[in-house]
Design a protein with these regions (language model features):
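Coil-to-beta-strand transition motifs
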Residues: 10, 79, 89-92
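Central antiparallel beta-sheet cores of small beta-barrel/beta-sandwich binding domains
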Residues: 2-75, 115
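Edge beta-strand at a domain terminus
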Residues: 59-66, 86-115
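Glycine-centered tight beta-turn/hairpin loop motif at sheet-sheet or coil-to-beta transitions
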Residues: 76-79, 99-101
Length: 115
């Protein structure tokens, strides 16, 4: 998950999910300032840029703290809520809530793309 620095009222991320020497999914996330709050849009693609849905899922801000943010879905999609936290300088945690399932966390560690 790679985030582009915020500028002009927006921030964006590109995600690539890999495993077993193959890419299984790409994801684009944007967060924009809208009417004094934040709106998140998220969309996923299979390899070959085959969209998994007709369009992005939209979420609205429900909570923000010094080191976390949480959004809830306002349109149809795979998630009912999505959050992020940054408990320390090297850790970034994605909090995913799917309908009818408990929240699961995806902890990420900082790493260089220039290995």
């Amino acid at each position: 998950e790679n985030w582009i620095m915020g500028e002009a009222g927006s921030i964006a991320a590109m995600v690539r999910m890999t495993g077993d020497d193959a890419t299984s999914m790409f994801e684009m996330i944007t967060i924009e300032e809208v009417d004094g709050s934040l709106v998140l849009h998220i969309q996923q693609w299979d390899p070959g840029m085959v969209a998994r849905t007709d369009g992005p899922q939209e979420m609205e801000l429900v909570e923000i703290t010094d080191n976390s943010v949480k959004f809830k879905a306002t349109s149809e999609g795979g998630m009912s809520a999505l959050g992020y936290s940054h408990p320390d300088a090297d850790t970034f945690i994605i909090h995913v809530e799917n309908p009818g399932r408990p929240v699961f966390d995806i902890p990420l560690k900082s790493r260089s793309i220039w290995k």
